[in-house]
A protein has these predicted regions:
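Alpha/beta-hydrolase superfamily serine-hydrolase fold, recognizing
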Residues: 1-277
Length: 277
């Protein structure tokens, strides 16, 4: 069993690589022989914007505690609609497992962290690791799968259809348009929804999950997240929901006391999951 101490303070280096042609991965590498646990990081941006640097505040802090963090770019809408980026993240999960030794990491410890729409994407890949629409990209000379040890979800869009209805009510034309640009139809929003997967009773993987969200998040209503957490638990999953009073969407991407507290919770949750066989 790997030893991970969330109170570690380790020097890190940053490496820029590619995990498939034209798609970059930034690896935050702790110094030392390891073996270290590892995380795939999936950024947000309404499935359309931003890149692998978005979650740098959290990624660096996690890496400094002794976790290899691989923050990935992926294909984005509107040129690459659903489920293209889920397939890329599925591949990235397999790639990190297959390359774990290169980063002094243990492939059996690989988890996922995702923020906003990235929380949706990493959740779908983890809940449906063998789905043919997600797992079709070949990874030569590897038999690794996309199952994940645990998930750290930061203000995640785990219910895209419910969020779409919400932004219609609030008149958020930008998110309406970008959601339509990625999914195309409301049927696709429901099919590719972690929340709807649970509501349908679809058989799925349920890795232990921590959700962090601010109560002032106007991007996805907290009650929807609470309903997801309840459904996840009802389906037999281990889930913790930590709400941050008065904090907005994306609050953890800005250095400060609340992002520090969020990262501390993530480290604690990771340590708990990694201590289990």
């Amino acid at each position: 069993m790997i030893k991970y101490d969330p109170d570690n303070r380790i020097e890190i280096t940053v490496k820029e690589l590619e995990y498939q042609d034209g798609l970059a991965v930034r690896v935050y590498q702790p110094a030392g022989a390891g073996p270290f646990p590892a995380l795939v990081d999936v950024h947000g941006g309404v499935w359309t914007n931003a890149d692998r640097t978005q979650n740098e505040v959290m990624d660096r802090a996690l890496a400094e505690s002794g976790i290899v963090v691989a923050a990935v770019d992926f294909r984005q809408a509107p040129d690459n609609p659903y489920p293209a980026q889920v397939a890329d993240v599925n591949l990235a999960s397999r790639w990190l497992k297959s390359r774990a030794a290169d980063f002094n990491a243990d492939p059996n410890t690989v988890g996922g962290i995702g923020s906003s729409s990235g929380g949706h994407t990493i959740s779908l890949s983890a809940m449906r690791p063998y789905h043919p629409d997600y797992s079709y990209i070949d990874l030569p000379d590897s038999d690794a799968d996309a199952t994940l040890k645990y998930l750290l979800l930061c203000w995640p869009i785990i219910a895209p259809y419910e969020r779409y209805k919400y932004v219609q009510e609030t008149g958020n034309d930008r998110i309406i348009g970008l959601s339509e640009g990625y999914f195309g139809t409301t049927d696709a929003m429901k099919e590719g929804s972690p929340f709807q997967i649970l509501k349908r009773g679809e058989k799925s993987a349920l890795p232990p999950t921590l959700i962090v969200q601010g109560t002032a998040d106007t991007n996805l209503p907290v009650p929807v997240t609470e309903r997801f957490a309840a459904a996840f638990q009802e389906a037999g999953g281990d889930i913790e929901l930590e709400l941050f009073p008065g904090m907005p969407h994306l609050f953890g991407n800005t250095a400060g006391p609340e992002s520090d507290r969020a990262v501390a919770l993530m480290k604690k949750f990771a340590a708990k999951c990694l201590s289990q066989a």
